[in-house]
Structures are given as C-alpha cells and as structure tokens.
Amino acid sequence: LCHFVGKRLATSALLLTIAMGMLSAVGARADQANVTMILATGGTIAGKQAAAGQPGYVSGADSVKSLIEAVPELKEVADVEGKQVSDVGSQNMDAKLWLELLRATSEALARPEVDGVVIAHGTDTMEETAYFLNLTLKSDKPVVLVGAVRPATALSADGPMNIYNAVVVASSAEARGLGVLVVMNDEIHYAAEVTKTNTTNPDTMKSPNRGRAGVCDTGECVFFSPTTKRHTTNSAFSIGDNVASLPYVAVVYAHAGMTAAPIKGALDAGAKGIVVAGVGDGNMSDAALDALTAAAKTGVVVVRSSRVGSGVVRRNIEVDDDTRGFIAAEELNPQKSRILLQLALMTTNDVGTIQDMFHAY
C-alpha cells in the first residue's frame, strides 16, 4: 500500500476486506492484481562474487529470472514478469542502450495489464538513465529504477529488499503521474533530484536539494509531495523509432589551474554543446571562460553547472551569462545537464529557449 502523507486512501470496501481477513499483510496483492514488469540491465544488483565476503565481483552476472526468484515475497505484491534488456555495469550505459531501454519500457507500459515497470540498474549512472526516461517516456504509469551497492552474493546484500520495495511502489496507484522514480535503501526519489553520493554505502542515493520523495517500510510506501518539474506525459521531448543516437555534448571539469585544453578537445571532437562542471556557483578560470565564450559565438551551446553536488547555479552572478551567451543549469548537476542539453539540441539551439527548459525540467 502507498499513500501521500495526510491523504486518506483506504476505501470502506478495502477496510471491510481487511476486516474479513482477506488481505493477509500490508502491501499484499489482491486477486485481480495486474502485472509489474521487471526489466534487467545488469549492474551490481545482479553481480556475483567468487566467494561471499570478497570485495571483487562480476557485474550483471545474474539474470532477471534469478533476481525475481531471490525474492519469493514478490508474489504477494504483484504478478511479476521479467525481461533481460542488457547485462552491463552501468558505467557502460550509453545512448544506444538508453534508446533500447526507452523502447522496451514503452512497450511494457503500453500493455493494459501492466501496472508499472521496475528497471534493475547499476547505481553508477542510475540517476542519468532515470532522468533520460523521465524526459522521454509518455506514460503516467509508475516506472521505478532500483539497484544495489552490494552484489547479490554478498553478506547482507541490499538488492532483494530494494527490489521488493521497488515492486511495491511500481504496483501502486499512488505512484502514477509522479514521473520516473528511484527506490533504494527504503527511500523513494524523483529522477530530477536524485544523485549517487557515496561509493560503497547502501545509503548512497540522495536528493540533496529538495529531499526524498517518500519512504518504504516492509510493504508500505509513503509519498511526501509531488515534484514540481515537468516529466513524462508533460514533457515536450519525444524520441521517434528512427532515432539511433543523441547529439554529442561534452562535460568538462573545472579545477584550479584549468586551461582551455579540455574545451579545445571537446570542440575538436565535434561537441554541439559543452557542460562545465564548474567550481562553486558554476565558475571557471579566465582561460576556460574565454574559450567557452568563443565557442558560444560559433553556435556551440554552453551550460554552466557545478561540481559541488548541491545548490543552484543562477544566471549572471559572477559570470555575465547574458553577454557571453551561456545557460545556467539551475538545480541540475553536470551529468543531468548533459542529458537535457542533448535532448534540447534535437529541436533547437536557441539559448533562451534552452534556458527555459533548464528551469522547467
């Protein structure tokens, strides 16, 4: 069962059902429960060690069938089906796999009997895949990304409980219309907000600016408030079946002593846009600033984000964005700024229009 704080969801019919003992536990499925589809892409959640307790493992070694069988309690929540989309560590996720996953997810959501989709995914780039799907899917049905920090064979593996909670959320009517979600470590996060914050701690996925969307607790989930960002059915972005790639956008990392070299490298590689992971409020050295200003004058779209990890990059504070023709990323980190810019460049290179997109999405 899922609900928003302060909102009563239970109907008298459901209360009567519970009173008659026909529902054995919170979150248990009704006889008429529809399908929750699990799409597996690989990642640590499907990883295997040579021996339990050893640090090394092979990512994506387990199949979607194994992931489902490891959590027999899922049958009390929903009728679960599985499909293997890929078996990669998420460091190897790319636009080709995103497009394949978008189409597999859309196909599943189009089935009337499917209530929602869970995507098992590595945590390294989970936030990027979630955000891409958040901008391109055209359904109000729940889509939940889930992963693990410990492989499936580890002592105290976190994957099984994460999958259970993800299926609870994906099968919930209350998760409809919220966009793509991430469920990890008993927490629910919106795709536009979430980021990975720790390399090895299961409590790694956080939403540093606006906070988590909700929580899960053994078959029950509670949502706190809806997101204010546009997504899914309210998104202007659309990916046709004939799209095979996305525009090349580079991310350059600012640091003390930064030169124009990484910017020149991005331009030489054919970048249509450049996102700066700037210091502080999206700042950079004078050398980098001059190189990016020159690039913007040639039509390359430049976005200032921040390497800090939280906060807002605003226009015209230390950098005169109006004069230089730059875009301020607002709340988006560099990796999500890159995705939004890639999608924006498929339809426009107008700086004002793209700045509005960074405000809306």
Predicted regions and their residues:
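Internal gly/pro-rich beta-alpha loop/helix module
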Residues: 146-218
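Short Gly/Thr/Asp-enriched flexible loops that form oxyanion-binding sites at enzyme active sites
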Residues: 119-141, 284-293
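Accessory alpha-helical/coil subdomains and C-terminal extensions
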Residues: 32, 39, 43, 63, ...
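Bacterial N-terminal signal peptides that target proteins for export
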Residues: 1-15
